[in-house]
Amino acid sequence: MSSRTGGRQAMSELKLRRLLEHNARLKDDLARPRVRVSEASASLIRYCKTTKDHLVPSVWGPVGKSEDPYGQTSGGKCCSVQ
């Protein structure tokens, strides 16, 4: 009979520990700083409008060879394996 009681107590302690860990995670989530969706979307739109993307020339216009970070280097001494 005492082994049953010990097993139940161990299960109860395990459940308590899990609940305490879950409670701690929930408290951490609650303490995390939040940003409103409207602020986040406005920030994303502002970033997209001000950051030039060289891979979308239809929006930003053609990119000069000297400005293109994805263009081929003029050194010509390196080989390219594809």
Swiss-Prot record:
Residues with lipid group (S-farnesyl cysteine): C79
GO cellular component: heterotrimeric G-protein complex
Molecular function in Gene Ontology: G-protein beta-subunit binding
Lineage top rank: taxon: Eukaryota
SUPFAM superfamilies documented for this protein: Transducin (heterotrimeric G protein), gamma chain (SSF48670)
Membrane topology annotation: Peripheral membrane protein
Gene3D superfamilies per record: Transducin (heterotrimeric G protein), gamma chain
Localization, UniProt: Membrane
Keywords attached to this entry: Lipoprotein, Membrane, Methylation, Palmitate, Prenylation, Transducer
Annotated propeptide span(s): 80-82
Key word Lipoprotein present: yes
Residue numbers spanned by region Disordered: 61-82
Lipid-carrying residues in chain (S-palmitoyl cysteine): C78
Protein name: Guanine nucleotide-binding protein subunit gamma
Organism: Lentinula edodes (Shiitake mushroom)
Lineage: Eukaryota, Fungi, Dikarya, Basidiomycota, Agaricomycotina
Gene: gg1
